[in-house]
């Protein structure tokens, strides 16, 4: 899926950056390919910045956008004669969205590592046992956990109940 997305973005960048079909209306004054190029991982190495005049930009003779090192786009450094300083007439500087994106990227890289993934630990579930008739209309009788007979006491209780059922009801003579 990632490979497909990269191929699609590159195709959009190539189509909108080419001069085929003359000057087309696009997003603002920049062709969409200029923004699609910045989505690529090469953002850390190069940026597309406006170039005015000359025959080197994506817009050919009418200016347009050109790939240049990030340092020349976001700093005042002069990167040789090829790119020149940012404040010159050749480059118009980076759009404010790009400055914000770079600032957020630097902030994210400076943040401490989050560590391992968060593990959700559920509390143990308590199952309520229901005894009595299983008819849909009849209410079920529920016993508290302390009232349930367990182990030997369950056997004793059942034998005493079975004995009482055969002999009938008797008063205890205390």
UniProtKB/Swiss-Prot annotation:
GO CC annotations, alphabetized: egg chorion; extracellular region
Swiss-Prot/TrEMBL keywords: Secreted, Signal
Signal peptide: 1-17
Claim: Cell wall biogenesis/degradation is one of the keywords in the record: no
InterPro entries, alphabetized: Chorion_2
Ranges for region Disordered: 154-174
Predominant location: secreted
Lineage top rank: taxon: Eukaryota
Record's keyword annotation contains Signal: yes
Chain intervals with Low complexity compositional bias: 154-165
Protein family (similarity comment): Belongs to the chorion protein S15/S18 family.
Role: Chorion membrane (egg shell) protein; plays a role in protecting the egg from the environment.
Listed name of the protein: Chorion protein S18
Encoding gene per record: Cp18
């Amino acid at each position: 899926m990632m490979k497909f997305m990269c191929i699609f973005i590159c195709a959009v960048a190539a189509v909108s950056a080419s001069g085929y079909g003359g000057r087309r209306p696009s997003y603002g004054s920049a062709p969409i390919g200029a923004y699609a190029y910045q989505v690529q991982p090469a953002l850390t190495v190069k940026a597309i910045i406006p170039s005015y005049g000359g025959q080197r930009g994506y817009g050919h003779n009418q200016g347009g956008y050109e790939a240049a090192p990030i340092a020349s786009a976001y700093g005042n450094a002069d990167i040789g004669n090829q790119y020149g300083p940012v404040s010159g007439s050749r480059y118009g500087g980076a759009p404010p969205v790009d400055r914000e994106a770079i600032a957020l990227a630097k902030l994210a890289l400076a943040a401490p590592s989050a560590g391992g993934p968060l593990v959700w630990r559920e509390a143990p579930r308590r199952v309520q046992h229901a005894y009595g008739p299983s008819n849909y209309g009849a209410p079920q009788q529920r016993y508290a956990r302390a009232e349930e007979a367990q182990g030997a006491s369950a056997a004793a209780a059942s034998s005493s109940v079975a004995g009482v059922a055969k002999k009938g009801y008797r008063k205890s003579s205390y």
